[in-house]
């Protein structure tokens, strides 16, 4: 999905794409990394912190209602404001009945020219998370499958996939902004 600087237009476009995928029979729909805006991590700009939001919050509420309406699981990648000065690159998982199942915070944060993610994001909380925890590697028991969610750069570190698989994930999802 191509994005613009218009957050509301991007959200509406994502909603339309979710509806299209559901109409074609999709059961689990994963949006791209940080879908609500252009990929902003190519520059270090304090104004971009205004893009962050609480999770759960308005986006997860809207996607929960949509998931329930369509009977699909939605994986949404959002810029999370956890506390003042504490931000994460986070995915929220909404089950097919609209229930917010929880979140996963990106563990591996790149910092290379064009990918200044360490300027914006704190790594996720590692540890022996249980299914009810809001931290660490975890699985989400959805209506359709036990899923694991990791984010973009996490794919270059095989222990993330291994841990999540050993925890019982049937399938892994990796929302990414860079392909």
Regions found by a protein language model. Name each.
Residues 53-55, 65, 82-171, 175-179:
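Active-site catalytic loop in hydrolytic enzyme cores
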């Amino acid at each position: 999905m191509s994005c613009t600087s218009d957050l509301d237009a991007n959200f509406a476009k994502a909603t339309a794409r979710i509806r299209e995928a559901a109409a074609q029979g999709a059961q689990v729909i994963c949006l791209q990394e940080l879908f609500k805006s252009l990929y902003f991590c190519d520059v270090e700009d304090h104004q971009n912190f205004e893009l962050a939001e609480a999770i759960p919050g308005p986006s997860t509420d809207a996607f929960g209602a949509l998931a329930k309406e369509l009977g699909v699981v939605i994986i949404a990648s959002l810029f999370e404001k956890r506390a003042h000065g504490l931000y994460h690159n986070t995915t929220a998982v909404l089950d097919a009945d609209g229930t917010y199942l929880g979140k996963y915070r990106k563990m591996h944060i790149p910092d290379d020219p064009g990918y200044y993610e360490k300027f914006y994001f704190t790594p996720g909380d590692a540890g022996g998370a249980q299914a009810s925890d809001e931290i660490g590697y975890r699985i989400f028991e959805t209506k359709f499958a036990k899923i694991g969610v990791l984010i973009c750069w996490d794919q270059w570190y095989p222990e993330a996939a291994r841990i999540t698989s050993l925890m019982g994930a049937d399938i892994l999802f990796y929302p990414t902004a860079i392909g």
